[in-house]
């Protein structure tokens, strides 16, 4: 009986270790979403070195083999862009803002044929250097593709909830 309990305990520890060290693809994709949100967020006391590191992290999360598609209402840069172009636009946009706070409110991941689709809702609070403040909650869809064993963002678009 004692040997059975020890065997069950060893199996339980092995399962927990497996789950911790080998997360599911969905968890890895959600982690990429967390990383891109963190690379865009900007606290008021952020220094130049932190900003540069975040810009590099942002660019590393994007597909650098193809253009990234952006289709977001009221976004001035809709269309297809290279990863370096988007990283440059992200850096410029962050310069105009005192703070950027993006919070993930919920996300659902679907993976099919090496393409991941994340339906998520994000809450934004942005304060510009000119004193304007924007608070908004919007649903989005992000698409990622597995490239060289890493999930890279290939598209961002608004999720149409209601059509006019």
Regions found by a protein language model. Give the residues of each.
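Hydrophobic membrane-insertion alpha-helices, especially the h-region
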Residues: 5-19
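Ser/Thr/Pro/Gly-rich low-complexity linker/stalk segments immediately outside membranes or between
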Residues: 21-37
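A mature extracytoplasmic/lumenal domain signature
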Residues: 72-74, 108, 120-124, 157-160
